[in-house]
């Protein structure tokens, strides 16, 4: 892994991210906006799946998901920029790997939802009860995104401090 880190830090892209002082703060702003979209919308949808806000049809909550995906793409690009800029601060940081774990868990949970539970819940209207499996998926998703938030916030304080 060290050879990869050394190579990545020697690239023009990595040096540019660190050298141009406006890139990092701009990426942080975009990352925060993206995270707000992802966690806000996914959290709203997850809470509906868990049985809260029953006055909202599941399809109405799901209609916001393209915005959540846009936020996720914003985070993917800016997160990659953070990693490329200073990979040595991430590869040995337990908080980074915990964040990656929760991101993967959220993704696998979303795939599980789409391939199993989603078809049974998408047409639920206002007042309809969601199946227990949907409630579990919603809870796992919400906890996954909270894990992403927590471990992402802990990055500067745990492991290789920034």
Predicted regions and their residues:
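Polytopic transmembrane helical bundles with strong interfacial aromatic enrichment
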Residues: 1-162
């Amino acid at each position: 892994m060290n050879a990869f880190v050394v190579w990545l830090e020697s690239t023009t892209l990595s040096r540019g991210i660190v050298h141009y002082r406006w890139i990092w703060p701009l990426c942080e702003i975009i990352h925060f906006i993206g995270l707000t979209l992802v966690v806000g919308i996914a959290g709203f949808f997850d809470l509906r799946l868990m049985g809260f806000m029953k006055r909202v049809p599941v399809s109405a909550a799901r209609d916001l998901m393209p915005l959540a995906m846009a936020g996720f793409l914003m985070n993917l690009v800016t997160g990659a920029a953070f990693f490329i800029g200073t990979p040595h601060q991430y590869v040995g940081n337990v908080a980074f790997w915990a964040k990656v774990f929760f991101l993967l868990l959220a993704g696998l949970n979303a795939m599980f939802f789409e391939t199993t539970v989603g078809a049974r819940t998408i047409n639920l209207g206002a007042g309809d009860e969601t199946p227990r499996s949907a409630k579990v998926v919603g809870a796992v998703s919400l906890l996954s995104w909270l894990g992403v938030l927590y471990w992402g916030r802990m990055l500067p304080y745990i492991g290789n401090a920034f």
